[in-house]
Amino acid sequence: MSAEEGTGDSTTAEVIEVVGKTGMHGEAMQVKCRIQEGSNQGRIITRNVLGPVRMGDVLQLRETQRDADSIGGR
């Protein structure tokens, strides 16, 4: 999404922790983020993010109800 496009129904969330890499080849990062507005304001959820991401980044989420599954280990 470019900066010129409208945000529509999206909600902003700030990355507070990078949990680790996930996906078949480690192409996605799992992050914990705090919802900054809306009915779920202040709630911390886990999401999978493609591309470079670090603490303090702000994400635009289309919906805030779903959590990502935790990264499994052996």
Swiss-Prot record:
GO molecular function, one term: structural constituent of ribosome
SUPFAM superfamilies in alphabetical order: Nucleic acid-binding proteins
Single GO biological process annotation from the record: translation
One cellular component term from this protein's GO annotations in UniProt: cytosolic small ribosomal subunit
Keyword rRNA-binding belongs to the record: no
Source species, domain of life: Archaea
InterPro entries: NA-bd_OB-fold (IPR012340), Ribosomal_eS28 (IPR000289)
Keyword field contains Secreted: no
Keywords: Ribonucleoprotein, Ribosomal protein
Xref: NCBIfam families: PRK04007.1
Family as reported in the entry's similarity comment: Belongs to the eukaryotic ribosomal protein eS28 family.
Protein name listed in UniProt: Small ribosomal subunit protein eS28
